Structures are given as structure tokens and as C-alpha cells.
Swiss-Prot record:
HAMAP family given in the database record: NDH1_NuoD
UniProt keyword annotation of Translocase present: yes
PROSITE patterns: COMPLEX1_49K
Summary of the function given for this chain in its UniProt record: Core subunit of the mitochondrial membrane respiratory chain NADH dehydrogenase (Complex I) that is believed to belong to the minimal assembly required for catalysis. Complex I functions in the transfer of electrons from NADH to the respiratory chain. The immediate electron acceptor for the enzyme is believed to be ubiquinone. Component of the iron-sulfur (IP) fragment of the enzyme. Component of the iron-sulfur (IP) fragment of the enzyme.
Pfam families associated with the record: Complex1_49kDa
Organism: Prototheca wickerhamii
Gene3D superfamilies in the record: Cytochrome-c3 Hydrogenase, chain B
Signal peptide location: none
UniProt protein name: NADH-ubiquinone oxidoreductase 49 kDa subunit
Main location: mitochondrion
């Protein structure tokens, strides 16, 4: 008697696909290994390090002033905010935090908020382009061009400014710049309205973002999220309010907070943060008084060009400052600022020489990218692009 063959259903196993690093939605050099069940993501494994340049080690071989430009090149979309964190850390070690001139503090806050608008414009419009809306991207870059002109007029560079330095800022604001920033601020609110008109109530935009990449408040804290990803989950934590630095305690602004913790909430928060940054920009312009823009201590800040050409002592100070740097007392500090992407922190250790003994950089994007696996799980492949866009990842700071 012939045995009946038992028919069993074939076992389908998941397959893996590589997303990036050449993919236009990978936001740089992200390589994702996705485990897929059909069109549904079961697991995502980010492979980082393709933009690793050894920044933290390089800083150990430079003096404190020479190390500053490395911070522009970490998150190369929010440059001055990172210079700001480093400068505050060095000032803490030098014990001069309370001596920074008031005008310099206002200028720092002004350009930190201009940088925040620069970052959020890129984040929102590139996110829209990833999802399929090209027009806001073109509008956003038109406005970013104006902001980069302000960067250029104050520092000579459109991106890597090296403008905020320990002890103050490199140069005073040129004549007419405050008036031009004021004019920009008056018209920029209507540009935000145009972007919102295109996206906020758009049916397709909402279908792609609502209930995608949901992060609960508990998950956000467990994964060390900060910035927009933390506030999108309903936690009103902003270092400018909770741990004010510079003149943020004098500024009136609100912290936008989400309720659902999804991609749509995070989009709305970024748009609202641009409006709040405009409020701060207007306040700094109105309240800024005349005065010196860096500490009057020739061991920490260089003399002006005029002084250098008239006084032999100033020339000697200038030469010694730029060749040997300045000695920082032994100690350590962790200093954080509210960068556009989240909490950007610098852990700086000094051994009493003119070079840092150790500089550990806490990049917000690194923590956010770790959460991609649980955020993308059980979503479609197309939603992964949306989630990466809403995380606002830049690989300069992730890979360092």
C-alpha cells in the first residue's frame, strides 16, 4: 500500500534588502539593512561609519581655538549651534562664563536662532521632497539663501563660519545687518504660511505622516531622544527654557509640544519652532545694546587689527595667541545646548595645557538613529523614508 505523501505548506522566510548608501532619501551615507516580510519591515539595522573622520581624536592634537572649526563640520546644517556648545564648554573650564559681554551673548543667541530656522527649513522641505512634494523644497532654499547671506556678511563664510569663539564672537555685526535681518523676519512668517498652506491640510501629506513612526513618551526617554523627537511625544523639554544659557532667560517664547508622537506632530513642531525662533530674533534685535563683542583679556581673545598695528605688545599677544593658543586650567565639564536636532553636548577634559585632553561629542542624531528599528517596525517600506526624514539625520554628527 502506497503511503500518502503529506503535503505541507512551504515556509516563506523573510528577505533582506539594502537601503542606501546611494539612495537619495538616505540623507547622506546611511546604509540600512532591512528585513522584509513582503512590503512590511520586520527589522532595520543601520550601518554607520561611512563618514567617520576621527574628529574627537583630531581635536586632541589641536589647541582650543584650532579645534573650533571641527564643530562646524559635524552637523553641517546647524553650524553655529555646535560652535556655541564648544565655546560655552571652554568658557566653563576657564571660569569666564559670567564675564562674556552682553552684546556678544545677544549676537550668539541671534545667530543660534537663525541657524535653527536654517535647519528646520531644510528638514521640513527635504522631508516633503522625500514624500513626493517638490515645490516646498524650492521655496525653502530660496529663504535659506537669504539666511546664508547673513552668515557670510558676519563671518565671510556661508556655512562653516567659525564665528562664535571662546570669550565672545569673532567680529561685530556689520552696518545694516540688523536692519536686513529685521526685514527678513517681517516677511518670513508669510513664507512659512505658504509652506503650511501646501502641506499641513494636504490629504496625501497627512496620509503619509499621521500614525507613522509613533514614539511614546516612555520610549522617547528610554532611547535618550531629545529635541523635536522628545517634544513630539508630549514632553516639554527644551534646554533654552529648562536650563537657560546666555540670554535665553530674558526671551519670551513657547515650547511647541505634540500629543500623538507621530511624524505629523514632529512636522508641526518644526514649523512652529521656526515661528518661535522669529520671535526670539526680533527680541534680540530690539534689546541688543552697543558694547564690546569679546572679553577684554589678551590671554584668551586676540587684539583687534587696529591695536595690533599700533602697539608692539598687541602684536606680541596676537602672535602668541595664534601660535600657542591659551592654557586652560585642569578640569572637566559637560555642556549642552538646544541644537535644532536636539541636545548637542560637549564633554571636555583639560589637563592644564593648551590642547584638550579629551573631547567627547554627544550628537542627538546618534540616539535618534538607534530608535529607527522600533519606529519602522511593521510599517511599509515607503514609510521608512518618511521616518528617516522626520528624524532629521545628518551623518556628519552621527559618524563624527
Amino acid at each position: 500500500m502506497a503511503l500518502e505523501k503529506i503535503i505541507t505548506a512551504p515556509k516563506y522566510k523573510n528577505f533582506t534588502i539594502n537601503f542606501g548608501p546611494q539612495h537619495p532619501a538616505a540623507h547622506g551615507v546611511l546604509r540600512l539593512v532591512l528585513e522584509m516580510n513582503g512590503e512590511v519591515v520586520q527589522r532595520s539595522d543601520p550601518h554607520i561609519g561611512l563618514l567617520h573622520r576621527g574628529t574627537e581624536k583630531l581635536i586632541e592634537y589641536k589647541n582650543y581655538l584650532q579645534a573650533l572649526p571641527y564643530f562646524d563640520r559635524l552637523d553641517y546644517v546647524s553650524m553655529m549651534c555646535q560652535e556655541h556648545a564648544y565655546s560655552l564648554a571652554v568658557e566653563k573650564l576657564l571660569n569666564i562664563s559670567k564675564d562674556i559681554p552682553l552684546r556678544a551673548q545677544y549676537i550668539r543667541v541671534l545667530f543660534s536662532e537663525i541657524t535653527r530656522i536654517l535647519n528646520h527649513l531644510l528638514a521640513v522641505t527635504c522631508h516633503a521632497m522625500d514624500v513626493g512634494a517638490l515645490t516646498p523644497f524650492l521655496w525653502g532654499f530660496e529663504e535659506r539663501e537669504k539666511l546664508m547671506e547673513f552668515y557670510e556678511r558676519v563671518s565671510g563664510a556661508r556655512m562653516h563660519a567659525a564665528y562664535i569663539r571662546p570669550g565672545g564672537v569673532a567680529l561685530d555685526l556689520p552696518l545694516g545687518l540688523c536692519e536686513d535681518i529685521y526685514k527678513f523676519s517681517k516677511q518670513f512668517a508669510s513664507r512659512i504660511d505658504e509652506i503650511e498652506e501646501m502641506l499641513t491640510s494636504n490629504r496625501i501629506w497627512k496620509q503619509r505622516l499621521v500614525d507613522v513612526g509613533v514614539v511614546s513618551a516612555e520610549q522617547a526617554l528610554d532611547w535618550s531622544f531629545s529635541g523635536v523627537l522628545l517634544r513630539g511625544s508630549g514632553i516639554a523639554w527644551d534646554l533654552r527654557k529648562t536650563q537657560p544659557y546666555e540670554v535665553y532667560d530674558r526671551m519670551k517664547f513657547n515650547i511647541p509640544v505634540g500629543t500623538r508622537g507621530d511624524c505629523y506632530d514632529r512636522y508641526l513642531i518644526r514649523v512652529q519652532e521656526m515661528r518661535e525662533s522669529l520671535r526670539i530674533v526680533m527680541q534680540t534685535i530690539n534689546e541688543m545694546s552697543k558694547g564690546i563683542i569679546r572679553l577684554d583679556d589678551r590671554k584668551i581673545t586676540p587684539p583687534t587689527r587696529d591695536q595690533m598695528k599700533q602697539s608692539m605688545e598687541s602684536l606680541i599677544h596676537h602672535f602668541k595667541f595664534y601660535t600657542g593658543g591659551f592654557v586652560v586650567p585642569a578640569g572637566e565639564t559637560y555642556t549642552a545646548v538646544e541644537a535644532p536636532k536636539g541636545e548637542f553636548g560637549v564633554y571636555l577634559v583639560s589637563n592644564g595645557t593648551s590642547k584638550p585632553y579629551r573631547c567627547k561629542i554627544r550628537a542627538p542624531g546618534f540616539a535618534h538613529l538607534q530608535g529607527l528599528d522600533f519606529m519602522a517596525r511593521n510599517h511599509m517600506l515607503a514609510d521608512v523614508v518618511t521616518i528617516i526624514g522626520t528624524q532629521d539625520i545628518v551623518f556628519g554628527e552621527v559618524d563624527r
